[in-house]
């Protein structure tokens, strides 16, 4: 089976328009992010807390802490150009 870690993403939209956001994760082979829709809508001025899971096969996440990176792409209705921001975290292997 897969090894999973759970993360609570706190996403804030400080703009005056709805934000459209997509997320992914990287750090090692065969890692995937689950628990989010393909595109998430965050209303203007809103903050959402979303639990997500990051999963991989145990052979890729040996015992200990492994650096991973969440990648977020977003745009607003007015500005259709995708922008991005990355956040570092850790995946705990067994």
Task: List where the protein language model places each region.
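Transition segment at domain starts
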Residues: 1-7, 89-94
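Terminal connector regions
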Residues: 56-94
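Asparagine-centered strand-capping/turn motif at beta-strand->loop junctions
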Residues: 10-15, 74
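Intrinsically disordered, low-complexity Pro/Gly/Ser/Thr-rich segments with frequent PxxP/GP/PP motifs
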Residues: 31-59
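Short aromatic-acidic-glycine turn motif
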Residues: 27-37, 77-81
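Short, solvent-exposed loop/turn segments enriched in Ser/Thr/Gly
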Residues: 2-7, 48-49, 63-68
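Short acidic, flexible loop segments centered on an aromatic residue
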Residues: 16-30
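Short edge beta-strand/loop segments characteristic of extracellular beta-sandwich folds
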Residues: 6-12, 53-55
């Amino acid at each position: 089976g897969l090894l999973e870690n759970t993360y609570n993403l706190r996403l804030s939209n400080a703009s005056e328009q709805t934000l459209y956001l997509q997320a992914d994760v990287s750090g090692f082979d065969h890692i995937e992010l689950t628990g989010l829709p393909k595109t998430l809508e965050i209303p203007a001025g809103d903050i959402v807390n979303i639990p997500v899971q990051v999963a991989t096969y145990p052979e890729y996440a040996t015992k200990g802490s492994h650096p991973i990176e969440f990648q977020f792409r977003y745009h607003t209705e007015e500005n259709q150009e995708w922008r991005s921001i990355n956040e570092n975290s850790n995946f705990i292997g067994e």
